[in-house]
Amino acid sequence: GFWQCKLRYQTQDELLNVAREYKKRGLPISVIVIDYFHWPLQGDWKFDEKYWPDPDAMIQELKEMGIELMVSIWPTVDYRSENFQEMKEKGYLIRTDRGFRIVMDFQGNTVHYDATNPAAREYVWQKAKKNYYDKGIKVFWLDEAEPEYSVYDFDNYRYHMGPNVQVGNIYPALYA
């Protein structure tokens, strides 16, 4: 069926009003997408309670309407994220040989998690599982999978599996 997505639903009320309007008009809809910045900070992998105050009720109402919910997940971790320090200490973030570890400056200074590290993948999955999957969300949009860097200084980035120039193209497959 039809998947409804836009750049972007900013609140739970906005999203539910759109879904209700589809049903009111008798328009077919199978999936509705919550795109990026539904989280407090990149790397938190959960709904921002300020804008999404009751995800459980939202998911339940959508299911009652026969609509699945998809959420966008990004691999970026803001320095201020509740998960940043732990991920840094455990070696779950992409490293650099020189300069700052900031690889993307978009709505915060961020570093990508290292998808070539199996433990890092498990860490991110456990966050997504707890905050999305266990609530009933079974459809994910793994965005920013290139990964997208602000500075394409490929010889500077280091992954668990090796230098970016040698293993960087495997990132999207392992992120998935």
Regions picked out by a protein language model, each given a short descriptive name:
Residues 1-176:
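Catalytic-domain carbohydrate-binding cleft regions of carbohydrate-active enzymes
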